[in-house]
Curated annotation (Swiss-Prot):
Induction: Negatively regulated by the two-component system YycFG.
Record carries keyword Cell inner membrane: no
KO phenotype (gene knockout): Cells lacking this gene show sensitivity to lysosyme, in contrast to wild-type.
Protein name: Peptidoglycan-N-acetylmuramic acid deacetylase PdaC
Naturally occurring in which organism (per UniProt): Bacillus subtilis (strain 168)
Keyword annotations from UniProtKB, A to Z: Cell membrane, Hydrolase, Membrane, Metal-binding, Transmembrane, Transmembrane helix
MF term (GO), any: metal ion binding
Binding site for a divalent metal cation: 286, 336, 340
EC primary class: hydrolase
Family matches, as CDD domains: CE4_SpPgdA_BsYjeA_like (cd10947)
Activity regulation, per record: Activated by divalent metal cations; Mn(2+) is the most efficient, followed by Ca(2+) and Mg(2+). In contrast to PgdA from S.pneumoniae, these ions are not absolutely required for deacetylase activity.
Predominant location: membrane
Length: 467
């Protein structure tokens, strides 16, 4: 009996030893790859601390720096951001084969406080990540925090509610970056990267005198050109920027800010319309159709004219590039319903859905929300007008190109009825109409007409009436 007890005692001791050894080696392993959170003081801003997440592991290493402002809401969010970057990196490296490479996977995140004032602080994170392959990847991530709102800001938040800020930023960015010949070499990429979409302008910093925009590698130019940035003078945006982000006292930096590398101090020259010269508005319905619509856009560009395209939501969803090109080249986009029904035969609810769904898809693709609507067949009533809250744009000249598919017939009908201040209706989905439009655009230009959008035409009429 005693021998059995001794035997079980020895077994128990052995088990404890094994468990202890396992625990020792397990703890030793954790210690070796422990994530350390170091804290030190920022050299520029004494009230800001720098926290660092570090791991110097066998197969990967990372160092993630982030600022601590002693502002609970902001600090919590920045800490979550840093930890999320680490978790994402660990997830991405989990299954990477390290047997055939001597280079460890790496994540390095550093930051710079580019602006710190009473109103806001702007933090730009620079992230380098290497996970196998020939090269690592570098990206920028920005945070703008409003102390009065106690909230982080998106690009939407800094502009006035009804401001068409995306188109203004798009216009400025495109023309500024195009001044660099190397960037201008790939015009299609530049246009895509500066198109009026929120995601193209999501990396920004509110500074003392500027709104600085950042563009990642490959966004607007070939990879070898790297990241790009432009800093737009706030004075150029004063008509659309919210007052609290312009106020000198509130936006005065705690230290002297560095002068930006690429400063924008003047707006690109926009073509103006002379109200004393003949004007005519070409309008195109039922598109887009890439083949024929782009043909018309080519002619407008060649003769430095503009037009208004009343598009169908059902077609826009399939041809977003054509829609973006329309806007990028200074043309106007209007709403022509989703699927071209006679709106007055629908219930008000159904008719509004046709319009609103089209508004939404246009805005989703381009960032632009039309102000003009052209009801199919011109069918409209007072109730719909009041409910839509959009300007209704009809026409003066209809060559019935949808019925008579003959280029000469279409050209003759338009030219015979063309006149100063008139609006022409053509459909951009037919080849014969596109061919006719080429000739019409040339002839009208030769006759001294300025080819304008519907909105420009209305503005000219107002200017003339005011005289």
């Amino acid at each position: 009996m005693l021998a059995k007890r001794i035997k079980w005692f020895h077994v128990l001791i052995a088990v404890v030893c094994v468990v202890g050894l396992i625990g020792f080696f397990h703890n030793h392993s954790l210690k070796k790859e422990t994530v350390m959170n170091k804290v030190r003081t920022d050299s520029q801003y004494g009230n800001v601390e720098i926290a660092t997440l570090v791991n110097d592991g066998k197969t990967f290493n990372y160092a993630v720096n982030y600022p601590v402002f002693k502002n609970e809401k902001m600090d919590s969010a920045l800490k979550r951001f840093a930890e999320k970057e680490v978790r994402q990196f660990q997830k991405e490296t989990k299954d990477v084969d390290q047997e055939h490479t001597t280079k460890r996977n790496e994540l390095n995140v550093d930051y710079k406080i580019v602006h710190y004032a009473k109103q806001t602080v702007a933090i730009v994170f620079n992230e380098y990540k290497y996970i196998g392959g020939a090269h690592g990847q570098t990206v920028k991530k920005t945070f703008n925090y409003d102390f009065s709102k106690q909230a982080f800001l998106s690009i939407d938040d800094i502009f006035k509610e009804d401001a068409d800020y995306l188109h203004k930023l798009s216009l400025i960015a495109y023309h500024e970056l195009k001044k660099n010949k190397d960037i201008a070499a790939d015009d299609a990429l530049l246009k895509e990267g500066t198109a009026p979409k929120k995601e193209n302008f999501s990396r920004f910093a509110i500074k003392e005198d500027y709104i600085e925009l950042y563009f990642d590698t490959y966004q607007v130019a070939a990879g070898y050109l790297g990241e790009q940035s432009i800093a737009i003078k706030k004075s150029l945006l004063k008509d659309i920027l919210k007052e609290q982000y312009i106020d000198k006292a509130k936006n005065k930096n705690k230290i002297k800010e560095q002068k930006p590398k690429h400063e924008v101090i003047s707006l690109p020259k926009e073509e103006t319309v002379d109200p004393n010269q003949k004007v005519i508005a070409l309008t195109f319905d039922d598109g887009p159709n890439p083949a024929t619509t782009n043909q018309i856009l080519d002619s407008l560009k060649k003769y430095k004219g503009h037009a208004t395209f009343f598009v169908l939501g059902s077609r826009v969803q399939y041809y977003p590039e054509t829609l973006i090109r329309m806007l990028k080249e200074g043309n106007e986009v209007g709403n022509h319903s989703w699927s071209h029904p006679l709106l007055t035969r629908l219930s008000v609810k159904e008719a509004l859905k046709q319009i609103n769904d089209t508004q939404d898809i246009i805005e989703k693709i381009s960032g632009y929300r039309p102000t003009l609507v052209r009801p199919p067949y011109g069918g409209i009533n007072d109730e719909l007008r009041s409910q839509m809250k959009m300007d209704v744009a009809l026409w003066d000249v209809d060559p019935e190109d949808w019925k008579d598919r003959n280029k000469k017939t279409i050209v003759d009908r338009v030219m015979n009825q063309a006149g100063d201040g008139r609006t022409i209706l053509i459909h951009d989905i037919y080849r014969t109409s596109a061919d006719a439009a080429d000739e019409i655009i040339k002839k009208l230009t030769d006759q001294g007409y300025q080819l304008v959008t519907v909105s420009q035409l209305e503005e000219v009429k107002k200017q003339r009436e005011a005289k």
